[in-house]
Amino acid sequence: MPKMKTHKGTAKRFKKTGSGKVKRSHAYTSHMFANKSQKQKRKLRKSALVSSGDYKRIKDMLPK
């Protein structure tokens, strides 16, 4: 059986942690910052973990 290929769009958006969880960045961070509060912008800077339902789909696209 051939090797699984990595889905490159997924690889650019997600990173696996050492324990096997998947990290993601927040949406709404490219423009229109004047309409967002300082607190909201600060929280958007931090990375988040992928939810368990999405993890099942993403893990097949990131074979490594």
From Swiss-Prot:
* Biological process annotations from GO: translation
Q: Which GO terms describe its cellular component?
A: cytosolic large ribosomal subunit
Q: Which SUPFAM superfamilies would you find in this protein's record?
A: L35p-like
Task: Report if keyword Ribonucleoprotein is assigned.
Answer: yes
MF annotations from Gene Ontology: structural constituent of ribosome
Q: Where is the composition biased (Basic residues)?
A: 1-26
Residues covered by region (Disordered):
1-64
Q: Which key words are in the record?
A: Ribonucleoprotein, Ribosomal protein
Composition bias of kind Basic and acidic residues appears in: 54-64
Give the domain of life. Bacteria
Would the keyword DNA damage be found if you checked this record's keyword annotation? no
The similarity comment for this entry is:
Belongs to the bacterial ribosomal protein bL35 family.
Q: What protein name applies here?
A: Large ribosomal subunit protein bL35
Give the organism, scientific name. Answer: Oceanobacillus iheyensis (strain DSM 14371 / CIP 107618 / JCM 11309 / KCTC 3954 / HTE831)
Top-level taxonomy: Bacteria, Bacillati, Bacillota, Bacilli, Bacillales
Q: Which gene encodes it?
A: rpmI
